[in-house]
Amino acid sequence: MPVTDSNNRLKVGVFGIGLDAYWPQFQGLEQRLRGYTEQVAGRLERSGVQVVNLGLIDTPEKALTAGHEFRRADVDLIFLYVTTYALSSTVLPVVRRAKVPVIILNLSPAAAIDYAAFNRLGDRTKMTGEWLAFCQACPVPEIANVFKRCRIPFFQVTGMLENDPLAWTEIAEWIDAARVAHIMEHNRLGVMGHYYGGMLDIYSDLTQQCAYFGGHVEILEVEALAALRREVREPEVKKRVAVFHQSMDVQPDCPPEELERAARTSLALDRLVETHKLGSLAYYHQGTGNPENEDVINSIILGTSLLTARGIPVAGEYEIKNAQAMKIMDSFGAGGSFTEYYAVDYNDDVVLMGHDGPGHLTISEGKTKVRPLTVYHGKLGRGLSVEMSVKRGPVTLLSVVQTVDGRLQLLVAEGESVAGPILEIGNTNSRYRFSIGARRFMNEWNTHGPAHHCAVGVGHLSGKLKKLAGLLGMDCIHVG
């Protein structure tokens, strides 16, 4: 569930660094650099983010105090603005105690010093003070050296304080990535049922997921959903069927009794999510002949699609890694729909990808269709399913990959959702084109050993995903 509690917002720390020995030597320098620091802090402000601004730190003593303040404030990320040369001893105590990633801002107040005006000053003390106001780059190697030796994760943005869209886009992406990391840290992932037997690639280490992403995993029983379904009343069912018609393109051959069956399960799912405060869900259930449980699972797709559209992504086949990937994509505002290879169109050089089960209604090209299926291929029973293509335009694929040495990494590819014929079989189904071509894309993607499912979202997000991986201590591999 997206983090909306005002007490649980992303907290971003910011401080500038300087050298107290300069202030009596160069008139106005301290005030000027404090002004730059306030300017940076102001530009970090945005909805859903609390900025903790500690101003200009210029002594080791102030640095130690700042470290305690950041820790008390529980900041998720620190922006270190280098205003001029400063001793690394005024930096280390701040970030060492906070124990969060650091973004070093090496931002000059202008594109270049006005050399002619500078050299006309005539007073070498004034000239030195002016130079020091442009001396942001000077201490960065010193700081980086110390951070490396202290194993403090850090990243850099280099550019200008003003008139530099590239630098400020980078900064915005760091905030966005930190916001998603914060959401994952507080996410409650429900897992209901069991794995699809024999799909060895999707078996996951839940402790490993918590180690990297944080959050909580809630183990759920299908019987709990069935019990909630028994409590649903007829008037609620009629209203939910109306919601189906409003939010999806229900095809004429969908039997009314199937829509009502799906509505009951959808309402029960909502209650399950609310009871356990879930932000995402992975599920699968084969069953042993219990009619009530089978009835629930066979009618789950419309309800899980509605949840996915609400920012509570649902992954079928108990695909926990992909539930995480879908939550990441949705938290970036890109959607995050469950998908896998379907086929290849070598004539058009596109990869067809889709899946049965939930689709992400908000990233559909047009209204998502609801179709009846007399069989769920490879699964139990029959019922209603959704058919959609992802919106035309740029897309990003994301897989959370478990490596042989017990680590997690993000695997990313950018492509384009293109128009053309699809398989009208009541599944999500899209055509994706990649700059490196369909053959090379598949070979390179598969080489990294992801599970056969991945999440697809709209827009190109590789820059943000790389930053998220950095904040989480993961590698990020970009295919293409």
Name each region found by the language model.
Residues 29-45:
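Short catalytic helix/loop segments, enriched in acidic residues and glycine
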Residues 93-120, 125-137, 303-317:
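Short, acidic/small-residue loops that bind anionic groups at enzyme active sites
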Residues 379-480:
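Extended hydrophobic packing segments that form well-structured cores
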Residues 238-332:
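Long, internal scaffold/assembly segments composed of regular secondary structure
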Residues 75-84, 103-106, 278-284:
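Periplasmic-binding protein-like
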Residues 2-5, 9-12, 51, 111-241, ...:
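Cap/lid and interdomain-hinge subdomains that line or gate substrate/regulatory clefts
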Residues 307-424:
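C-terminal catalytic subdomain
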Residues 63-75, 94, 266-275:
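Short, well-structured alpha-helical segments in soluble
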